[in-house]
Amino acid sequence: DDLKLETWLNEYIWPLEAHLNGEYCYAGALLGCVEMIKSGTTTFNDMYFYMDHVAEAVKETGLRAVISHGMIDFDDEEKKKAEIKESKRIIKKCHGMADGRVKVALGPHSPYTCSRELLEEVRSLADEHGLFIHIHVAETKDEVRQVKEKYGERPFTYLDEIGFLGEDVIAAHAVWLSSSEIHLLKSRGVKLSHNPTSNMKLASGISPVNELINSGLCVSLGTDGAASNNNLDMIEEMKIAALSQKIKNMSPTALDAGTVFKMATINGAAALGMADEIGTIEANKKADLALINTKRSHLTPWRNPASHLVYAASGCDIETVICDGEILMENGKLKSLDEKYVIELAESAAEDLISKA
């Protein structure tokens, strides 16, 4: 906690991740799925390692997910080949798992950790297989500086020059953008994932979300990983997103409750190419529902649902969750998992991993 992104990654996260294995990732994924179900999330997009183990956790829990192997090569040709090979393995093994609830995307980490050649191969694979691309872009000022020094352009401009951008790209963060990049993103149909808590905790900055939405871009909402948040509560994330935009713009009207609620629901579905299936309650869509107990003191009187959900509620108010028509939690009790077992498994995995660091 309480570190700059570069220090956090280089000195803590990446060294610890060198000791990861599939069992650790499975335990962590199960724990994350429990937390998401209990706070009302039915669908998530995640980039990490050992993603076949993550897919298995998704299958067992009943959630829906878009997963991708996180690729980093730092201009190392052998590493690039290994990353592409692993991504292809995950595509073959996991795409369409769990009756279609698991889909695979491609996950190049970022423009500053991936070579141009890797990014170009990712674009070719996405075109060949019809897959989405999940990437982190313009998260910090230092990232923008590194990309400009190496390639002579800002991150999104560089990605466009190599033919990377498109409607199938989901770019996380997008904190440090120029006006020309915003116009570029709109013209290319790039989807964005706003992660306000993570960006503020790491002091990366505050994305110009109000301007992005007013420009017509599809901006969804995310928590980022639990290591930089430190929870996966999307209801809490809505409030933080709204309040951070109000202070950034010095305007109480910036990012109203209705808009931020759409970011957490239909915009997320649209970003993942699922707007015709989920994201709203409509006839012929999949039954993805989260039921909230409105008879709580902090939610009374119940007059403005969007306002209450964004500014007053929390994930703890969710009582029942349904994904793809299956009840995953009812009256606060998980149906698909033994919560005590998952917590014990994750705690044991964490202790074992830390002992190796």
Please give the residue ranges for each predicted region.
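A structural motif
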Residues: 39-41, 63, 130, 189-190
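Helical hairpin unit composed of two closely spaced alpha helices linked by a short loop
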Residues: 201-203
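Active-site gating loops and adjacent loop-to-helix segments of metal-dependent hydrolytic enzymes
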Residues: 1-26, 61-76, 81-84, 141-168, ...
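Metal-coordinating catalytic core of metallo-dependent amide/deamination hydrolases
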Residues: 53-176, 180
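Alpha-helical scaffold segments that flank or form the walls of functional sites
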Residues: 1-62, 86-97, 347-355
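His/Asp/Glu-enriched, well-ordered alpha-helical/loop segment
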Residues: 161-168, 210-296, 312-313
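Divalent metal-coordination and catalytic microenvironments
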Residues: 40, 58, 106, 136, ...
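Active-site microenvironment of metallo-dependent hydrolases
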Residues: 262-357
